[in-house]
Amino acid sequence: MRHYEVVLIVHPDQSDQVVGMVERYIKLVQDNNGMVHRLEDWGRRQLAYPINKIHKAHYVLFNIECDGATLEELEELFRYNDAIIRSLVVRRDDAITEPSQLAKSADEKRARKAPRSENFDNDQDDESNDDSDE
């Protein structure tokens, strides 16, 4: 079995159905003795260029290990699903399990924002404590 990295660009109106779509594709891979090594939902992002007059879309990345027949079936499902604007399948030498650069940067942003909000809450508590002393 070979390793593949799959990126899907889904129509923004279908963002609610992304979870169901991805679950269906993962089930297909697992039913055919494949494995899913990584799954990342990148969310709604700006496209580099408009596709069919659409400027934003929902991105999903997953790394799988499957045979050729399963991959062909997946690609056919991608092709005939109107919600999928574009799909990209790249063969990889090894399974990739660590988070992508995009996911790492998103985690770092969340980590930087968390202390700020905690400081803001502490500042408000300090102000309320100052008022109670008077």
UniProtKB/Swiss-Prot annotation:
Annotated Basic and acidic residues bias: 105-119
InterPro entries, per the entry: Ribosomal_bS6 (IPR000529), Ribosomal_bS6_CS (IPR020815), Ribosomal_bS6_sf (IPR035980), Ribosomal_S6_plastid/chlpt (IPR020814), Transl_elong_EF1B/ribsomal_bS6 (IPR014717)
GO molecular function: small ribosomal subunit rRNA binding; structural constituent of ribosome
The keyword Ribonucleoprotein belongs to this UniProt entry's keyword annotation: yes
Keyword tags: Ribonucleoprotein, Ribosomal protein, RNA-binding, rRNA-binding
Region (Disordered): 99-134
Stored Pfam families: Ribosomal_S6 (PF01250)
Bias-annotated ranges (Acidic residues): 120-134
GO biological process: translation
Origin: domain of life: Bacteria
Gene Ontology CC: cytosolic small ribosomal subunit
Family as reported in the entry's similarity comment: Belongs to the bacterial ribosomal protein bS6 family.
Family annotation (NCBIfam families): S6 (TIGR00166)
Function noted in UniProt: Binds together with bS18 to 16S ribosomal RNA.
The protein's name: Small ribosomal subunit protein bS6
Lineage per the UniProt record: Bacteria, Pseudomonadati, Pseudomonadota, Gammaproteobacteria, Moraxellales
